[in-house]
């Protein structure tokens, strides 16, 4: 049964990748792992920052000493590299999915010594929606689960049988977990070691030799991971994730994913809310949903005094407890309804084992009742799984325009993506591989340094990549919006450079006013707009100091001019460089509206393709 389960999980993963995730998933960790894979395939740990780390930094990555590198450890990207060397990186994902299902079978067989229970547990795991939903994405949760389950089995059997190879394998498996998800290695280590120590507590000296053999497998991988840290961060004990953002760490306090995002206080109250939200969605991704939870509780209660069942219960509770103090629990809980509670994936193996114990126990006494329960488990899960897969399919389709928008480019190009802070955060296909020499160089719209980047690449045609919806509308949701993505040629302008166009009163506003700012300082005082007004603003009249500048034309609304000046509504932004008695600007510039996003407490600038009441452009003589 074990080979059949592994093969079925492997095939399921490949099918789901093709049918549900044709254009990746909503989770932007995926493109980071794929970019990391490309870097490793090139024989590198990092890539050059091109002198513009603020423009070229991908999501969940760090910049240091002229280099850019992923915040993640190498364990999972190396698996993807192996798959790509075999011809298809998806093979690594499929192998991780198979490992999780096979690991469930192996652990339950080890704990119950009953292959029927193990086979049923493996089937239940395979049929749980979490396998289909997570088995098609380039994320490491199922892979790490498989490693952890096999680690426990190898450790237990190695100690029991005095098997050196099993003990070394146990250490190697735990080492690869450390190489993949360092924090998880500590949790899995405790789950494996504590039951063994308790069982052998009357002869602890006998565990010294097994521990030494485990160390033989563990320590080399730990050493490699620490050497990678030393190479990238300058310290063996500092991981790339804290270089990416020092506030991305375990424990309560001020926390943040990346420096350009808002920080927030993560404390016990928010941790409890987040854990509760994850716990609420957990059953929906388990075979039988809440019926499955009830049966798992029955199985745990019926054999509650058995150490094997106690270990399954501990496995089910360990990760929710361990991740309680990690702020990622809050962030992941916001999308748990879409893809499951990702940090709690190990709990599904434990729950399936307990359900299998309950069903086989019922089957011995009342076979008919057990059969009915098994059918009900499937009937409950089918509509839930179908619904979740359909939502994820739509979320994947919403990514597609980002890829297709650049397919027609037949010459070296520089594509400036939406101003969301980091490459890959909105456009999952916008990475630069292992160097900056690809046909398309992607850069973020993170300030006037974009103009310098365009000047430095005269061999590339520059384009502005924009969607017809603001970034906030493209975040993952139950009802994803598929954007239309446009590429607009960018051009450097000089000569008699000026902002030219018209501004109109905003309908419904008591007073509309416009003003101009340079680098967030007012250069033109607010002027009332009571009818369509022509604007002609020469850059040479702004007394710009030599260097790069951001020029904003703003329109506000209010009861009078002064009030309108404190309530901006529309903005056109341009980047210029002053020097040598001339000014060079980058057209066409960007547009934005000052709105309050859904669920937000404060308004913010949201990107727009056009502004009906502020139609101004940068006008001048092309300089290239």
Question: Where in the sequence are the language-model features?
Answer:
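Catalytic lumenal/periplasmic loop and adjoining terminal transmembrane helix
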Residues: 230, 361-480
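Short acidic/glycine- and proline-prone juxtamembrane loop motifs at membrane-interface regions
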Residues: 133-143, 183
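Transmembrane-helix motifs of polytopic, lipid-linked glycan transferases
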Residues: 90-112, 149-154, 295-298
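Short helix- or helix-capping micro-motifs
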Residues: 121-126, 153, 174-178, 192
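Signature aromatic-anchored transmembrane alpha helix within multi-pass, membrane-resident enzymes
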Residues: 2, 172, 189, 193, ...
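Hydrophobic, aromatic-rich transmembrane alpha-helices
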Residues: 99-101, 193-205, 275-320, 355
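Membrane-interface transmembrane helices that cradle and orient dolichyl/undecaprenyl
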Residues: 79, 109-115, 151-167, 177, ...
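Membrane-lumen/periplasm interface segments of multi-pass, membrane-embedded glycan/lipid transferases
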Residues: 54-60, 208, 230, 235-303, ...
């Amino acid at each position: 049964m074990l080979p059949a389960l592994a093969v079925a999980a492997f095939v399921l993963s490949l099918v789901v990748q093709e049918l549900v995730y044709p254009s990746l998933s909503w989770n932007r960790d995926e493109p980071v792992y794929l970019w990391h894979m490309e870097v490793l395939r090139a024989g590198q740990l990092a890539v050059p920052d091109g002198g513009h780390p603020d423009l070229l930094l991908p999501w969940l990555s760090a910049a240091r000493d002229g280099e850019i590198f992923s915040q993640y450890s190498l364990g999972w990207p190396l698996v993807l590299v192996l798959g790509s060397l075999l011809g298809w990186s998806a093979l690594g994902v499929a192998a991780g999915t198979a490992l999780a299902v096979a690991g469930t079978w192996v652990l339950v067989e080890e704990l119950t010594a009953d292959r029927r229970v193990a086979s049923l547990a493996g089937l239940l795991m395979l049929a749980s929606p979490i396998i289909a939903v997570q088995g098609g994405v380039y994320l490491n949760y199922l892979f790490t689960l498989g490693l952890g389950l096999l680690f426990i089995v190898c450790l237990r059997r190695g100690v029991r049988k005095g098997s050196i190879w099993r003990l070394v394998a146990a250490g190697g498996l735990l080492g690869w977990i450390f190489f993949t998800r360092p924090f998880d290695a500590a949790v899995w280590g405790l789950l494996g070691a504590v039951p063994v120590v308790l069982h052998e507590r009357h002869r602890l000296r006998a565990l010294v030799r097994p521990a030494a053999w485990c160390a033989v497998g563990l320590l080399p991988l730990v050493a490699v991971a620490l050497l990678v840290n030393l190479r990238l961060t300058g310290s063996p004990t500092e991981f790339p994730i804290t270089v990416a953002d020092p506030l991305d760490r375990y424990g309560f306090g001020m926390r943040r994913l990346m420096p350009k995002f808002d920080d927030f206080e993560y404390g016990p109250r928010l941790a409890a809310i987040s854990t509760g939200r994850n716990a609420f969605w957990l059953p929906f991704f388990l075979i039988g949903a809440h019926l499955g939870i009830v049966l798992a509780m029955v199985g745990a209660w019926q054999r509650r005094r058995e150490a094997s069942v106690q270990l399954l219960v501990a496995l089910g509770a360990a990760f929710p407890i361990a991740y309680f103090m990690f702020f990622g629990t809050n962030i992941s809980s916001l999308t748990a309804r879409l893809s499951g509670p990702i940090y709690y994936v190990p709990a599904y193996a434990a729950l399936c084992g307990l359900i299998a114990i309950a069903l086989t126990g019922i089957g011995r006494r009342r076979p008919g009742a057990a059969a009915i329960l098994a059918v009900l488990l499937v009937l409950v899960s089918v509509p839930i799984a179908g619904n979740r897969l359909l939502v994820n399919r739509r979320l994947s389709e919403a990514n597609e325009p980002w890829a297709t928008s650049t397919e027609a480019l037949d010459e070296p190009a520089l594509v400036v993506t939406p101003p969301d802070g980091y490459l890959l955060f909105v456009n999952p296909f916008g990475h630069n591989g292992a160097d900056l020499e690809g046909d398309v160089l992607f850069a973020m719209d993170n300030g006037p340094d974009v103009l310098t980047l365009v000047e430095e690449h005269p061999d590339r045609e520059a384009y502005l990549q924009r969607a017809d919806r603001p970034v906030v509308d493209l975040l993952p949701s139950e009802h994803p919006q598929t954007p239309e993505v446009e590429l607009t040629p960018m051009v450097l302008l000089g000569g008699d450079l000026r902002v030219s166009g018209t501004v109109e009163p905003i309908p419904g506003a008591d007073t509309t006013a416009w003003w101009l700012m340079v680098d967030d300082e007012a250069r033109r005082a607010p002027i009332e707009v009571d009818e369509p007004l022509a604007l002609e603003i020469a850059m040479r009249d702004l007394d710009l100091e030599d260097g790069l500048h951001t020029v904003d034309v703003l329109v506000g609304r209010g009861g009078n001019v002064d009030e309108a000046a404190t309530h901006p509504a529309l903005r056109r932004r341009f980047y210029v460089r002053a020097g040598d008695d001339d000014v060079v600007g980058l057209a066409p510039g960007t547009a934005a509206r000052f709105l309050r996003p859904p669920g937000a407490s404060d308004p913010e600038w949201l990107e727009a393709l056009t502004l009906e009441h502020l139609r101004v452009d940068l006008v001048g003589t092309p300089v290239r």
